[in-house]
Regions:
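Flexible "arm" and connector segments at domain edges
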Residues: 1-64, 68-127
Length: 127
């Protein structure tokens, strides 16, 4: 991850983009995420169906890379350690949504219900 961050920092500096405002990068992340979402508009493809559609998969990889790049660019510009913040978030999510609880009901709908219940309880506690 450090090598990737270093490469992105050089990429930004070479284009004089190392002075971008975090608000502009946040907007770009949102725009690129919307473009990623647009690939699925009016469809409800599962993982298997998505993997089968090679054309969609190529477009998806491009949009996903855009989101990743902007997110890492923001971390680099703010001198944040991307790996460290991702691992910290993963640890918080592991506590918030324990695997055993999420696996309890094996149906997709049951897992979604458990997720939403946990999320609502969490938000109520943290108001």
């Amino acid at each position: 991850m450090k090598k990737l961050e270093k490469d992105i920092k050089a990429y930004l500096k070479a284009r004089n983009w190392h002075k971008l405002r975090p608000s502009d990068i946040a907007k770009s992340i949102s725009i690129e995420a919307a473009e990623l979402l647009e690939l699925f508009q009016w469809q409800s493809l599962d993982i298997k169906e998505t993997k089968k559609d090679k054309e969609k998969l190529e477009k998806l990889k491009g949009e996903l890379a855009d989101v990743f790049l902007y997110a890492i660019e923001m971390a680099v510009l703010l001198d944040l350690d991307s790996e460290k913040i991702i691992r910290a978030k993963l640890a918080r999510v592991e506590k918030k949504y324990p695997a055993a609880l999420m696996r309890k009901n094996k149906s997709e709908h049951g897992t979604q219900e458990a997720y939403l219940k946990i999320k609502q309880e969490y938000r109520a506690k943290n108001k």
